[in-house]
Amino acid sequence: MTTPLPRPNRQLPLFSQAPSTPEDITRTTPLKATFDLFAQRLITDGKSDHTIVAFSADLDLLAAYQGEATPIGDIAITDLEGFFDWMENGRDVPCSRKTYARRMTTLKTFFKWLHEIGALRADPAKGLVQRSGPAPLSDVLSPAQLRDCIESSRTFTYKRGKDPDTRPEMLLRLLMDTGIKKNEAMALTPMSLVLDDPKQPVLQVRFKVRNVFKERNIDLASTWLPLYDAYARQYAPTAVIFDCTARNLEYVLSDIGDKAGLPFKLSFEISRWTCGLRDLRAGMTDDYIRQKLGLSDISWYETGGKLRELDRRLHERGE
C-alpha cells in the first residue's frame, strides 16, 4: 500500500493570480505558481528540452508532496529533507540513484533561482546533502602519473621502424586537454580544428543529444599544434583525424599506461576524468567544466561531486 502523502495536495484557488514576471514572485507566492517562470528561465539559459521536462516533473512531485498552494517562503530545509526521505522510503515507486541525484539538482537549481531573484531571503536547498549511494569513483592520473605517461608516449616507433610514432603523444595530450569521449574523438576531422588564431587554437566537437547534433568549442593548448602537425605529416589524415578503429586507439592508450607503470588500465574514460580534475584544480568554474565536457546540469551534479572527491583523495596523498 502506498504511504499517504504527509500533506494534502491543495489546488490553487481559482481566483489566485499567477505572477507574470520573476519580479512578481514573493515569499507568499504559491509554489505551483512559480513553475512556469522557472521553466522560462531554463529556456533562456539554453537548457535542453529533456532537462526542462525532467525538472518540471520533479517540481510537480515536490508540489504533490508539499502542497501546490504552499507559499514558497514557508518551505524550509527540513521540508525538503522530508521530501527526499518520502521519495526513497515512503513511496511505492523505486527511486534509482540517478533519479535521486537529478531531483536533488532540480531542487537546488529551483530554490537557488528563487533566492537570486530576491523572492527568498535564504536558499532552503543550499544545505541539502546527497544521501543516495554514489557510483564508484573512476581511477584518475595524478600529476606524477601524467608526466610518466607523457614520457612513455614518446617511446613508440612508427610501424616498428626507427622513426618515433607521433600518434601516442598527440592522442594523449588531446584527451588530457579536452576530455572528449571516444566517439567524439573518432568523429574529428581536420576541419574540427579552428586555427584562425595560432596562439589559441580551438577544437570544434560535434555531439548528439536526442538525435540532434550540437557543437561545443574547446580551447586547445598552442603547444599541441606542433604535435598535430607532426602527426599529420606521418599519418596524412583526410576524412577523419584518426583513420583507424576505436579499439586501436584504446590499445594505444593501454600501451602508454603499461609503459608508464600505471596500476590500472589507461582509457578514454580515465583521460576524461583526469581532464576534468586538472581543470578543477586550475580554478575553472563548475559551469566551464560542465560545458567543456558536454554535460547537462543533471549529469554534472554527480560528476562535480566525484571530481571534488577525487581532488580530496589526491590531496590527502600529497599529489
Annotate the PLM regions.
Residues 36-50, 56-137, 158:
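N-terminal core-binding DNA-recognition domain of tyrosine recombinases/integrases
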Residues 148-182:
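Basic, Lys/Arg- and aromatic-enriched nucleic-acid-binding interface segment
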Residues 107, 171-172, 179, 183-188, ...:
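Alpha-helix N-cap/helix-start motif at helix boundaries, enriched for small hydrophobics
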Residues 1-44:
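N-terminal DNA-binding module of tyrosine recombinases/phage integrases
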Residues 187-224:
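Conserved tyrosine-mediated DNA breakage-rejoining catalytic core shared by Y-recombinases
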Residues 219-263, 275:
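Active-site/catalytic core of tyrosine-dependent DNA strand-transfer enzymes
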Residues 158, 251-291, 295, 309-318:
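Short, basic (Lys/Arg/His-rich) helix/loop patches that form interaction surfaces
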Residues 120, 134-152, 211-222:
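DNA breakage-rejoining catalytic core of tyrosine-based enzymes
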